[in-house]
């Protein structure tokens, strides 16, 4: 007997449930499916890579395949013809079995280890701040040490420059004393010569050196103040940073070695031989390396470079001025020595002339005395009774001869003429002797003046050689100028010269 089976394709009319009931069930199922997808998607997005957002306009499987493509290993060809698979660069977990390297995932919600993670992050931040403070303190301390070294060099150079300035001032005092001492020469020796011109030139050059050295001292003083201020600023910032690292037991030099930098200020020294050093970090107003620290280090670097140039210039000026001052002093001393030699030559010539004149005066005096005796002999005796018989004109034979007017004897006339001639000659000799004596006295006074001038020049040279010795300080030379007063020439010599 045939059996009737129900149709497998249920028709619209064969359904028992109501359509509303069926639509409600489908809506509930669809709503649950959407809720499941949304919740699953939200649960996954709480723990996924940062750039894992897919394009909504692309199918899910296509977007996922495109997103996972960079995770796969790269195949590189070797020189020998083989291949080598390498994971892609970057952070992530390498899956060697699956030949993939997905990127690191980040959680957006706190996990069970959230408290420990936050504590670890806080410790890392604090330790990073302490390390940064320690590194900054090490940099500031090293910069302060270099500034201190530059300060010591500058102070030492200032002492050398000050000693040279004292020598220049002492040279001015020696020049003043030389001019003052040469002013005590006799008037005839004060005719301006090359030695006086050299003394004036020496004074001018010494004043120029003095101004130059004083300018160097002023520049170095300003630089010294700037270096001291920079050192105090670096010390303040260093002590401020050391408050955060006073419990850390690592020396600051070791920190600089770990950073790969020996100094952030001295750029002239060779770098520390390391593979790679840390660069100077950018200034951070709320970090350990603040703009104030950066400004202090930059100022220290600038002052260090400027001080090196100034120290080089000061040392060069000191050596040049020392050589120039020595050369000028030697020229003045050689000029005075030449003047002394010329004075000695003139003294020898004047001494010879004075000796010849003395002999001439003696001969003239002797001849004059003889002429006076001759004049007395020619004039005859004073009394008549002392006449000889041959000298008497009242003899009988003579009176008989003189009876005629034309036969008068010329004896008396010729005796009177001879006596008058001798008298005029004696007067002329007296005049010549007076001129000779006056010239002799003037020559003797000139010789004495030459001797005084030679002695004064010798004293000036001796004074200059003694006073320019390094053991003679500026105060000793100053006391000599203020207290010592050489004696003036004698009054009798001055009166003799006026004659």
Swiss-Prot record:
Cytoplasm as UniProt keyword: yes
The keyword NAD appears for this protein: no
Residues that bear Phosphoserine: 14
Compartment(s) where it occurs, according to its Swiss-Prot or TrEMBL record: Cytoplasm, Cytoskeleton, Flagellum axoneme
Protein keywords: Cell projection, Cilium, Coiled coil, Cytoplasm, Cytoskeleton, Flagellum, Phosphoprotein
Signal peptide (residue range): none
Residues in coiled coil: 201-225, 308-328
InterPro entries with a match to the protein in the record: Tektin-like (IPR048256), TEKTL1 (IPR038949)
GO cellular component, one term: axonemal B tubule inner sheath
Gene Ontology process terms (BP): flagellated sperm motility
Main location: cytoplasm
Chain residue ranges for the region called Disordered: 265-286
Phosphotyrosine: modified positions: 372
Domain of life: Eukaryota
Protein purpose: Microtubule inner protein (MIP) part of the dynein-decorated doublet microtubules (DMTs) in sperm flagellar axoneme, which is required for motile flagellum beating. Forms an extensive interaction network cross-linking the lumen of axonemal doublet microtubules.
Subunit structure: Microtubule inner protein component of sperm flagellar doublet microtubules.
Protein name, entry field: Tektin-like protein 1
Species assigned in the record: Mus musculus (Mouse)
């Amino acid at each position: 007997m045939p059996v009737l089976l129900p149709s497998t394709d249920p028709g619209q009319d064969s359904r028992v449930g109501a359509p509303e009931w069926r639509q409600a069930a489908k809506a509930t199922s669809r709503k649950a499916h959407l809720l499941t997808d949304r919740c699953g998607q939200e649960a996954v997005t709480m723990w996924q890579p940062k750039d894992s957002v897919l394009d909504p306009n692309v199918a899910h499987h296509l977007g996922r395949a495109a997103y996972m493509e960079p995770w796969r290993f790269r195949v590189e060809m070797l020189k020998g013809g083989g291949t080598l698979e390498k994971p892609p660069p970057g952070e992530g977990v390498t899956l060697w079995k699956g030949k993939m390297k997905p990127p690191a995932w980040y959680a957006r919600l706190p996990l069970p280890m959230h408290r420990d993670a936050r504590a670890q992050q806080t410790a890392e931040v604090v330790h990073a701040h302490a390390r940064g403070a320690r590194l900054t303190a090490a940099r500031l301390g090293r910069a302060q040490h270099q500034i201190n070294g530059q300060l010591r060099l500058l102070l030492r150079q200032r002492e050398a420059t000050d000693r040279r300035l004292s020598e220049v001032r002492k040279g001015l005092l020696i020049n003043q004393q030389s001019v003052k001492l040469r002013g005590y020469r006799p008037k005839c020796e004060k005719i301006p010569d090359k030695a006086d011109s050299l003394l004036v030139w020496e004074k001018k050059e010494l004043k120029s050196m003095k101004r130059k050295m004083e300018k160097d001292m002023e520049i170095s003083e300003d630089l010294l103040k700037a270096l001291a201020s920079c050192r105090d600023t670096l010390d303040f910032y260093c002590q401020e940073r050391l408050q955060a690292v006073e419990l850390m037991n690592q020396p600051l030099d070791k920190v600089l070695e770990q950073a790969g930098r020996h100094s952030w200020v001295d750029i002239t020294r060779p770098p520390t031989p390391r593979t790679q050093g840390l660069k100077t970090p950018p200034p951070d107003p709320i970090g350990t390396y603040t703009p104030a620290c950066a400004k202090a280090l930059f100022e220290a670097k600038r002052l260090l470079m400027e001080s090196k140039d100034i120290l080089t210039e000061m040392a060069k000026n000191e050596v040049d001025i020392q050589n120039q001052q020595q050369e000028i002093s030697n020229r003045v001393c050689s000029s005075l020595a030449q003047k002394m030699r010329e004075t000695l030559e003139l003294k020898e010539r004047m001494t010879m002339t004075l000796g010849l004149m003395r002999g001439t005066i003696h001969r003239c005096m002797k001849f004059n005395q003889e002429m006076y005796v001759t004049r007395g002999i020619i004039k005859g005796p004073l009394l008549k009774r002392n006449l000889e018989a041959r000298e008497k004109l009242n003899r009988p034979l003579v009176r008989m001869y003189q009876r005629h007017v034309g036969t008068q004897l010329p004896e008396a006339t010729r005796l009177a003429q001879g006596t008058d001639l001798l008298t005029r000659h004696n007067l002329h000799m007296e005049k010549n002797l007076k001129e000779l004596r006056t010239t002799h006295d003037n020559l003797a006074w000139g010789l004495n003046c030459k001797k005084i001038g030679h002695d004064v020049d010798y004293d000036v040279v001796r004074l200059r050689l003694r006073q320019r010795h390094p053991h003679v300080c500026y105060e000793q030379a100053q006391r000599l100028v203020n207290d010592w007063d050489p004696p003036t020439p004698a009054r009798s010599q001055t009166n003799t010269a006026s004659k």
